[in-house]
């Protein structure tokens, strides 16, 4: 018998309008903490908005595919195209198209991300 974790491949998200969205985990590029809400970016142009805080959603995301690389961001490592330097000591995660966003990596998280990626 399959476990519930193996069966459920969607993230339930409470929308700001009171709706409940079920977002496929593979479709998520990143989550970003906002002021009083969280943005969830997928391929669609308009991000999902959730009333749930980033740390609440983080508990429901499978590790190590989803990693909190910065206090304001959780990234799906399956959607990362490259790690790029930003200055002498800082790094960004560059995401796949169509998002093509650069997400900062906190210095204290860089070693953990290297380990997850096997670097």
Put a short name on every predicted segment:
Residues 2-119:
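Basic, polyanion-interacting recognition surfaces, primarily
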């Amino acid at each position: 018998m399959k476990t519930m974790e193996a069966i459920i491949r969607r993230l339930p998200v409470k929308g700001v309008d009171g709706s409940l969205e079920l977002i496929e985990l593979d479709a998520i590029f990143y989550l970003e903490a906002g002021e009083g809400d969280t943005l969830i970016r997928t391929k669609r142009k308009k991000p999902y908005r959730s009333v749930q805080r980033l740390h609440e959603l983080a508990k429901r995301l499978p590790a190590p595919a989803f990693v909190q690389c910065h206090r304001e961001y959780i990234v799906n490592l399956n959607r990362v195209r490259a790690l790029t330097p930003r200055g002498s000591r800082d790094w960004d995660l560059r995401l796949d198209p169509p998002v093509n966003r650069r997400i900062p990596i906190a210095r204290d998280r860089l070693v953990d991300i290297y380990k997850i990626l096997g670097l």
